[in-house]
Amino acid sequence: YRVLDACFGGTIGRCANRIGGASFTIDGREYRVTPNEGNNCLHGGKEGFHKKLWEFACREHAITFAYISPDGEEGFPGTVRAEVTYRLICDRLSIEYRATAEKSTVVNLTNHTYFNLGGHGSGSVDGHVLTVRAGRYTPTDSGNIPTGTLAPVAGTPLDFRTPARIGSFLREASLNGGRGYDHN
């Protein structure tokens, strides 16, 4: 995991997805972050959160991982304390993210774990049922760079507010030219 760029199983940050041109502006100040996908910054840069060693604490049915990202790491402003808690209760897995920043910054955490709930060798995940409690998403341009706006999921292939099969819309042209889900 330290040398691969695939991010398999990783907690992604400080900013999941792409930052176009590896720069952004907060409060009138431009910040340049580490480019690692052409001219863009993908998943927090060359040494994103998925490459870090996290502290952890175990509780019954849960484990919490914590990482402190110092001010200036990969070019991002402000120290950030990130926590990710995994809970397994009955047959339900939940992943909860928390981040606290010391000053205005960019934080967008996600997980890059891929589950096939049918088990190894069971085939496609198209029939898996997914629920996502999100009413909006970040549209992207043709280079998968977020446009900076939020759009409603209603009426799109990204609407999983009620349980739906993953494969129902997986190959829609509006999903990355038919390549699948790659959205916030």
Roles of regions detected by a PLM:
Residues 1-184:
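An exposed, glycine/acidic-rich loop-and-rim segment of catalytic or binding clefts
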